[in-house]
Amino acid sequence: MRARNAGNVGTVPVRPYTIVSCAISVDGYLDDASPDRLILSGPEDLDEVDELRARADAILVGAGTVRADNPRLLIRDERRVAARVAAGRPPHPRRVTLTASGQLDAAARVFAGPGTPLVYATAAAGPSARKNLRESAVVIDAGAELSLAAVLEDLYSERLVATLLVEGGSRILRDLLAAGLVDELRLAIAPFFVGDERAPRFALPARYPHDESDPMTLVSVRRVGGVAVHHYRLGERFKLRQVPS
């Protein structure tokens, strides 16, 4: 895969409309360092994320998130599932993950749901991924190095993914944001600290395009249950309809 024009500067990019949605502590952590998953948001926030999932054509997470959190990446509300089916869409978005090691377990919940997930693997990781997953996923050769721009272009051009929801992990979030491949950022901030440098952070060090000279546009700040949801526009493709009322 080779990206032709996956960014959002100058011309219309050949990639999905990309939304990043994640929950963090007030000091910027995505989780703590314990074996158990840290709960950062409540039912009201999770319901809004479920609505974002229902609007998306695919949901993307990294292999580290699959191993650490074992997510299902399915729509929870059956009414939203029914609405998608009534509109002629698949019941759930396509599930997508990326791996540079191929170390994925076919028993993970992400591979157990309806439909066939996509796994983008480096050339070196592809054989291991295919051996481990067998018929549980379609493994796609992403070249010597995983290019997120090329992955997004493939999702758009070959898999017909028009809207992509990205839910983690920290390195994928960093790389997408640093490469200018995100149109919309939804950040749910929990009212407590983690304070553990071993824990994964939201914004890892990088050269981000939206610095003090070109900041993101703050669209809204809302209280949703016990968290504060910050909503940002990162490019000209922003769709105002994505903001819940």
Region locations from a protein language model:
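Enzymes that bind and transform nitrogen-containing heteroaromatic metabolites
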Residues: 1-245
